[in-house]
């Protein structure tokens, strides 16, 4: 029996096409994935992300614990509400999950973990917390709605009350604030501005309806995937997992190597991988017709004239750009051209940094 979010009936009211997503009944689309994609790039769309898990980490050792648990360093967070993105690694340097951590105070943090990895994440966190003066509390009574797009903030402002609008005024990206019953964060998974709003389940349907009434278009998992891929954002389970280290997943920027005495989980393994040289995650664009898909092979010739091979981790047709884009894990000797094998033929592709669209415009 699949889990249902508190917004399940709202999805049905909007003719959501429901599919199983890691054990959750979630909307794939509400009629047109392409229209939903364009709504987020050009106006405002919203996603039910209540299947994600909110976890509060509270206690005297909260900072010390998270400095061990995460490859990024929460000690960098000094301003209440500031957030950072990073990997939770195993002892081999593999990515257990990628998550956002909000600093609320020196003794209180909030992390948001992926639905697909929830049980594994919580088991790992509860194992690692032993010996620390910390309470780890899952918050299943909280739902989450992401409102994204160039007009998302303006439309949300008509829904928020005066207290909430005052709280978010001038808020920079990657911050979160509790305002009355809502935790409102300037984060997202689309490459557009907007909010991710954590809301008590009892209020979630009314908030969803208020956003609908404000002209925010409901969007499903299909558009969520094309938007995040255009933005060059990883999807756990495709672009990385426990068999992949962050250096090979375009997450090297999220590893805080300094100070050298911070012994975060996976550090020793990761230092060895770094010294030996890791694969890298690149972006690919293809002018030819067709769509690059997960699992296809990528070939290129390195500077020594030796053929090298990599693998497509995510691929799609980009509605914004009008051609196929992909992310691929490849040996780090790759240049700026390669070939993808499609239907037993090799098709030329251009190699770029894995970021295709930001704020509605081509990013390369």
UniProtKB/Swiss-Prot annotation:
InterPro entries per record: GCS_T, GCS_T_bac, GCST_C, GCV_T_N, GcvT/YgfZ/DmdA, GcvT/YgfZ_C, TrmE/GcvT_dom1
GO cellular component term of the entry, any: glycine cleavage complex
UniProt-recorded Gene Ontology molecular function terms: aminomethyltransferase activity; transaminase activity
EC number: 2.1.2.10
GO biological process, alphabetically ordered: glycine decarboxylation via glycine cleavage system
Entry-linked Pfam families: GCV_T (PF01571), GCV_T_C (PF08669)
Catalytic activity: N(6)-[(R)-S(8)-aminomethyldihydrolipoyl]-L-lysyl-[protein] + (6S)-5,6,7,8-tetrahydrofolate = N(6)-[(R)-dihydrolipoyl]-L-lysyl-[protein] + (6R)-5,10-methylene-5,6,7,8-tetrahydrofolate + NH4(+)
UniProt entry keywords in alphabetical sequence: Aminotransferase, Transferase
Quaternary structure note: The glycine cleavage system is composed of four proteins: P, T, L and H.
Family annotation (NCBIfam families): gcvT, PRK00389.1
Stated role: The glycine cleavage system catalyzes the degradation of glycine.
Protein name, UniProt field: Aminomethyltransferase
Gene name linked to the record: gcvT
């Amino acid at each position: 029996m699949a889990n249902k979010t508190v917004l399940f009936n709202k999805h049905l009211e909007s003719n959501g096409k429901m599919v199983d997503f890691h054990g959750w009944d979630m909307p794939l689309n509400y009629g047109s994935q392409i229209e939903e994609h364009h709504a987020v790039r050009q106006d405002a769309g919203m996603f039910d992300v209540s299947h994600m898990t909110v976890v509060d980490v509270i206690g005297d050792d909260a900072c010390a614990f998270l400095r061990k648990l995460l490859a990024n360093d929460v000690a960098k967070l000094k301003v209440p509400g500031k957030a950072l993105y990073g990997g939770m690694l195993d002892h081999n340097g593999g990515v257990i999950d990628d998550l956002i951590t909000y600093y609320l105070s020196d003794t209180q943090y909030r992390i948001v973990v992926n639905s697909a990895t929830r049980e594994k994440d919580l088991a790992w966190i509860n194992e690692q917390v032993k010996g620390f003066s910390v309470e780890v509390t899952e918050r299943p009574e909280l739902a989450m709605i992401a409102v994204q797009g160039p007009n998302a903030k303006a439309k949300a402002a008509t829904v928020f009350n005066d207290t909430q609008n005052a709280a978010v005024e001038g808020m920079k990206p990657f911050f979160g604030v509790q305002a009355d019953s809502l935790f409102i964060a300037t984060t997202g998974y689309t490459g557009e501005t907007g909010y991710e709003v954590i809301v008590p389940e009892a209020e979630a349907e009314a908030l969803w309806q208020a956003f609908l009434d404000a002209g925010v278009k409901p969007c499903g998992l299909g558009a969520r995937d094309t938007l995040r891929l255009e933005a060059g954002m990883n999807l756990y389970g495709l672009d990385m997992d426990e068999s992949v280290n962050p250096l090979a997943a375009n997450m090297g920027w999220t590893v805080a190597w300094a100070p050298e005495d911070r012994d975060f989980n996976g550090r020793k393994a990761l230092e060895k991988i770094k010294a030996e040289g890791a694969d890298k995650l690149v972006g690919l664009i293809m002018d030819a017709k067709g769509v690059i898909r997960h699992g296809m092979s990528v070939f290129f010739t390195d500077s020594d004239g030796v053929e090298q091979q990599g693998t497509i981790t995510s691929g799609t047709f980009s509605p914004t750009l009008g051609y196929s884009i992909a992310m691929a894990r490849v040996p780090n000797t790759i240049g700026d051209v390669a070939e993808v094998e499609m239907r037993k033929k090799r098709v030329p592709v251009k190699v770029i940094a894995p970021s295709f669209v930001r704020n509605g415009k081509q990013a390369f």
